[in-house]
C-alpha cells in the first residue's frame, strides 16, 4: 500500500497561517497504481461513468488522488500569492487553478457518492463515509486561506462580469464566515468554537439516531391494521405475508401510522415516542438537552465573534431571504392571513370527529387520522385509490413533456448508456434545435435492497457544469425510493406526495445540470453561497 499524507504543512518561511494551525491531518491508504492510470479519471469512459469497470478500490484510489491534488493545488496558489502578489491575475492565476482541481474533485466525489447511495454493498459505508468527510474538509481549504481571501479583498471588481463578481462575492462571504477578518487571538478562539460545534453536532446526531431506533411496538391484532395500505403493511410486517402479521411499529413509519391507526392509545404511544427522542424523558445516556444548549451557546458565541447579533443574522449572509427582518415580516403576514382559516378548519375537524363517534378534544396524535377520514368523507379522497391515476411511467412522461414545452428542451432516453441497475434510466437533454446534449440525467426511481433509503430522494451532481471540465455535458443523478413494480404488468403507482417529490427533485436536477455559467463556484446549487 502506498501511504499518502493529507494535511501536511509546508516548510516555508512566510507569515503565520492560522488556518493551518487548526487543520487536522489525516491519512488515506491508497492501493498501488501507476501515474499513467490516473492521468485521466479512471471512473469515466467516453464522458460517462464507466459502470462496468468501477470497483470500490478504483473509487478509493481515484478520490484519494484528487483529494491530494486539490490540497496541493490550494497550497500552490497560496505560494504564488506570497511570492509575487503584484504579478497575478485574479482569474487566470487564482480562480482558474482552483477550478481545475476543484471540478475534478467534485466530479469524482459526486460519482462515488451516487454509487454509495444506490448500492452500499458495492460501496459500503466503511469505505465511503471516511472519504466523504475528508473530501468535505479538503473542499473548505480554499475558503480558509487568509492569503487567498486577502487577495480577493484587494481586487477591483468594477470591470468584472456579473458572473465573475458573484465568484468574488462567494469567496469573500465564505472567508468572512470562516473568521478570516479576525485578528490572531480571535481567529484561534473562533477555530475552537468551530471545532466544538462540529463535535457537539456529531454527538447530537448520534444520540438522535440511536434513540430513534430504540422504539418498537408489536401489533398482533389484524383488526387494527385492516385499513392500512399495502406499502405500510410491507414496511411493518415481520412475516413474508404482510397481511398476516405480526407488525412492528417504528418511528420510521410514524407519519403514515398516525394517519391510519384507529386505536388512539397506540397513536399516542407512537407519537410520544417520537416526541421524546433523545430527550430528558428517555435514558440519560441518550439525553440531548445538554448538547442542544451547547450548540445554541456556541452558535451565539460564533455569531458575536464575527460581529452579528445572532446566529440567525449570520446565517442570512448565504440566504436569498436577505435578513431576519424579511423572514419575520413574511411569516407575520402569512400568519395573519392563515390563522383564521386554520382555526376554522380545526373546529370543522373537531365537529367531524365528534359526529363520527370521537369523544374528547383532538390532540396532535389525533389530527392526522381524523384529517384523512374527513377528506375521505367530504371529497372521497383516498390516497390509495388516487394512486391508480399516477403510474410512474405516465407521470414521468408527462413531466418530461411539460418541462420540454416550458423550457424549449428535448429530453430523450439514452438506452445505450450502461447504468448501475436495470431500474436506472439515462436521459440526454438537448436544446430543441441542437444535436449536442446540454446535460445528462440518470433517474433511479425505485427502492431496493442495498439502496440507501431517503423518503424524499436526492439529487447528486456527478459532474458539475464548469469550463474547467471541458466540453463534456454536466451529469446528475436523480435517486428516488418509490415502490418498485410488482411485475411487468403492474406498474409502480405513486401517491400524490410521491408525485410532488418527483416534480420537486426533477426541478432540482435541472437546476444542477442546466447552468450556463463558466465557474463551479456559482454553478448549479451554488447559486447561493454556502
Model regions: which residues?
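Active-site-proximal, well-structured secondary-structure segments within enzyme catalytic domains
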Residues: 162-163, 167-169, 191, 196-199, ...
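C-terminal, non-catalytic "cap/extension" segments appended to globular domains
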Residues: 28-55, 65, 394, 398-410, ...
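Active-site recognition of the HExxH zinc-binding catalytic motif
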Residues: 300, 307, 403, 484, ...
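Alpha-helix N-cap/helix-initiation motif
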Residues: 284, 288, 388, 392, ...
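Acidic/histidine-rich catalytic neighborhood
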Residues: 515-530
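N-terminal helix-rich structural modules
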Residues: 2, 10-12, 19-227
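Alpha-helical segments
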Residues: 34, 469, 473-477, 493-496, ...
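Substrate/cofactor-recognition hotspot
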Residues: 280, 286, 293
